[in-house]
């Protein structure tokens, strides 16, 4: 089954069948292109698939000329605060939140939120 959702809060789906590393690279590349480079923070949660998606997002962002700051395992409020405090151009949060274990999500946001 392929379940993939794209909305204002990012992209989320079943890991492997809908949400893949290849898709994450494309999604991060689109975000990096939209930001026109700049500095982007990336953070993850503790899901087993999150490091794979972090690596994919790094690849996509770096390919578009972004500088990437690795925040490691970091909750969303801390990442939002860091973007404002450090003057980053945006961030990508990788984490499943309230979704079941086989799902994950990639949530981009700019310095404006």
Where would I find each of the regions flagged by the language model?
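Ferredoxin-reductase
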Residues: 36-111
């Amino acid at each position: 089954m392929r379940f993939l959702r794209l909305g204002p809060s990012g992209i989320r789906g079943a890991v492997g069948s809908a949400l893949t590393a290849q898709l994450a690279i494309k999604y991060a590349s689109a975000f990096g292109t939209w930001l026109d480079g700049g500095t982007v923070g990336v953070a993850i949660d503790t899901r087993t698939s999150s490091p794979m998606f972090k690596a994919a997002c790094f690849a996509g962002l770096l390919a578009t000329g972004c500088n990437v700051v690795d925040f490691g395992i970091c909750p969303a409020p801390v990442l939002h605060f860091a973007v404002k405090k450090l003057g980053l151009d945006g961030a990508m949060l990788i984490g499943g939140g309230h979704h079941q274990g086989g799902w994950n999500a990639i949530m981009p946001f700019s310095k404006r939120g």
